[in-house]
Amino acid sequence: MNKSIFWHRRDLRIHDNAGLHKALKSSSTVQPIFIFDRNILDLLPRNDQRVLFIYQYVQKLKEAYQKLGSDLWVFYGNPLEILPKLTEEKEFDSVFTNRDYEPYALERDKTIFDLLKSKNVEFHGAKDHVIFEKNEVLKDDGKPYTVFTPYSRKWKAKLNDYYLFTYSVEKYLGNLNKGIEEVKFLSLQKMGFSDVQLFPFPKDVTSDDLIKNYDLRRNFPSVEGTSRLSVHLRFGTISIRELARQAQHLNETFLNELIWRD
C-alpha cells in the first residue's frame, strides 16, 4: 500500500468523489491538497467572484477534513513546480485526481504525468466531473453527435446504475493522513484578489420538489424555480451523479439540462 496525494480541483467535496474514493481505497495514507493555480489566476480580474466562490468552498473543505482528524493542504503557485517538490520532500508514491477536460488542464496534466513519471511517482485520473466522457456516447458509426436530441436519446439509453454509482468514502476515511500540519493558507488579498462578495452565491443544496417542478417554474422570474446549481457543478461542490439519480426519477427536463452540460 502506498502513500498518496489526492489533488482536489473541480471537486470541492468529500462525499461521492470518485478520485478520492480510488485514492483512499488503494493507499495506506492519503493527503488531500488544493492548489490555487497561478497560471489560471494571473489571467483573471482581481474582483473575479469565481475566485472568491472557490476560496470559500476550499475553506469549507479544509474544515471538513479537520473534523475528520486530517487536513487539506492549500498551496498557491504553479502545480508543475509544487507537485514534484511535494512528492519528493514528503516521499509520496502517487498522486490521484479527477480528470479536467479544459485545454489548459489537459496540457498541464500531461506535463505533470511526465514529470512525476521521471521520479517514479504514479499519476492517476478518475472520471468524476461528468457522467459520460466524450468518447463514451457516440453514433453507431463511432463519430460524435452534433445534434442534441439524438445524443440525449443515446445518453439516456446508455445510462444505468454503473454510471450512477455512489463513491462512498466513509469506510476508507481511516486512510486519511492524520494531524493538522502548518501549510500556510494565504488570504485572498495575499493572492491579489478582493474578498468583497458582490452578490449572494447560490446554495449548494437542492430538493426533490425543486427538481420535480423545475420545468413548471423555470420560466417565471418571480418564482425561485431555477436550480442555480451550475456553479456548484462546475466546481464540484455537489456530485453530478447524485443530481442525475434524482432527475432520472423526478423530472426529464432537469435531466436534459444535465445532459446538455455533459
Model-predicted segments: where are they?
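Glycine/tryptophan-enriched, flexible segments
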Residues: 121, 147-262
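Trp/Phe/Arg-rich N-terminal binding region typifying the photolyase-homology
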Residues: 1-159, 250
